[in-house]
A protein has these predicted regions:
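Intrinsically disordered, low-complexity, charge-rich terminal extensions
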Residues: 1-209
């Protein structure tokens, strides 16, 4: 836990169980004075199905400051939408006679490149889906550093988390990517900036409901 600015503290949880985030929320709720304290948690259940897609699309545009240039979506996790599942249950008999290439697929985890424009992803969107995790590649504007940031809703309840899963340094004329590292301080600064920008986006979307 550390102070990010006057009277604002950021808490990072290195959880080992899916319910750890929930337990930490519960602990702070019991400890703090609710009349003067606000706890910021980004919960996927507060977003409608299409809003989860809007959330991640905005993160692509605004996740990090100009120091880092977005390059690509290199991993994406999505699953059948809650609204679509409920509709299928209500119309189960009809659906049995109307099969589609996506019938039976509940969740998909894709890795590769240019995934946001992937045809399979777009088909899933058309049928109703939820984006729950995305790994984004960024190139530093002034250094040869490239990072992969994992942004995901996970745990129980599914709350938003940010981690840097890969760090590369571009070497040679061909800009070959070699495994590298960031200092603990810089790693934290990048993750904090990303999470706080995500919070702004999340609050903007929720406020439109």
């Amino acid at each position: 836990m550390f102070e990010t600015k006057n009277n604002e503290w950021q808490v990072e949880v290195d959880g080992t169980r899916s319910s750890d985030g929930k337990e930490v929320q519960k602990l702070f709720t019991q400890l703090v004075d609710k009349s003067i304290t606000r706890i910021h948690v980004l919960d996927i259940d507060c977003l409608k199905d299409k809003q989860t897609i809007e959330f991640f699309d905005e993160i692509i545009k605004r996740g990090l400051p100009d120091e880092w240039k977005f390059q690509d979506v290199v991993a994406l996790t999505f699953r059948r939408g809650r609204d679509e599942v409920e509709e299928n249950i209500e119309n189960e008999d009809e659906e049995k006679s109307k099969t589609t290439p996506l019938t039976g697929i509940r969740q998909a985890i894709l890795e590769g490149g240019n995934l946001r424009d992937n045809e399979f992803v777009h088909k899933f969107e058309e049928n109703g889906c939820i984006f729950s995790a995305m790994t984004l590649e960024y190139q530093n504007a002034s250094t040869p550093e490239t990072i992969h940031i994992r942004a995901e809703f996970k745990g129980s309840p599914k709350i938003f988390e940010v981690s840097i899963v890969n760090i590369f340094e571009n070497e040679g004329l061909e800009a070959k990517k070699e495994q590298s590292s960031l200092s603990v301080k810089k790693n934290l600064e990048v993750r904090t900036a990303f999470w706080n920008n995500a919070r702004i986006i999340y609050n903007e979307i929720v406020s439109k409901q």
